[in-house]
């Protein structure tokens, strides 16, 4: 059975939002203290390339894998078909698994963990309230306000699922 991939590379040609930059910060923070110079790391789903470029600037040997050749990954491959040809210290997939069927995530991680010596880092979106940001600027006064409204459905058309949406619980994710 061939599954549908929901992704788009259109967003990588635009400037990122504050929330997207915060996401990068959280990705790096998650790896802080675990990933060191000269470590090897596989990144599946490279997005804009920020994380891999940052890690390379810190002398981490990064192998990038993405389904979208326009993003110029080291290897063009669907995550379900990628099998590392050697062992790596770390693996990361940030905001990737929600773009495929939930059940595929387990087989991908099982496939990868055989070749990872240290850590697997993953992040997925959490189904929560939708933030509405307002920015007010009057002369020298500036104020940013965020208001959260209840979210009733997945808004991103490229997501199959999000954590805590319907039966996609943390418990199910960790099993």
Where are these regions (language model features)?
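Alpha-helical membrane-targeting segments
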Residues: 19, 128-153
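Conserved beta-strand signature within the Rossmann-like core of class I S-adenosyl-L-methionine
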Residues: 117-126
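Conserved N-terminal segment of class I S-adenosyl-L-methionine
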Residues: 1-92, 106-109, 115, 152-171, ...
């Amino acid at each position: 059975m061939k599954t549908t991939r929901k992704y788009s590379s259109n967003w990588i040609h635009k400037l990122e939002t504050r929330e997207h930059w915060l996401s990068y910060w959280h990705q790096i923070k998650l790896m802080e203290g675990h990933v060191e110079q000269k470590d090897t790391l596989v990144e599946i789903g490279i997005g804009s390339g920020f994380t891999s470029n940052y890690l390379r600037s810190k002398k981490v040997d990064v192998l990038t894998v993405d389904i979208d050749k326009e993003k110029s990954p080291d290897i063009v491959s669907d995550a379900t078909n990628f099998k590392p040809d050697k062992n790596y210290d770390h693996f990361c997939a940030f905001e990737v698994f929600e773009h495929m069927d939930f059940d595929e995530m387990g087989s991908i991680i099982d496939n990868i963990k055989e070749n990872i010596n240290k850590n697997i880092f993953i992040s997925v979106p959490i189904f929560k309230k939708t933030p509405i940001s307002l920015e007010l600027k009057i002369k020298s006064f500036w104020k940013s306000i965020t208001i959260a409204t209840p979210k009733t459905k997945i808004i991103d058309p490229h997501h199959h699922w999000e954590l805590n949406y319907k039966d996609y619980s943390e418990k199910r994710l960790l099993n």
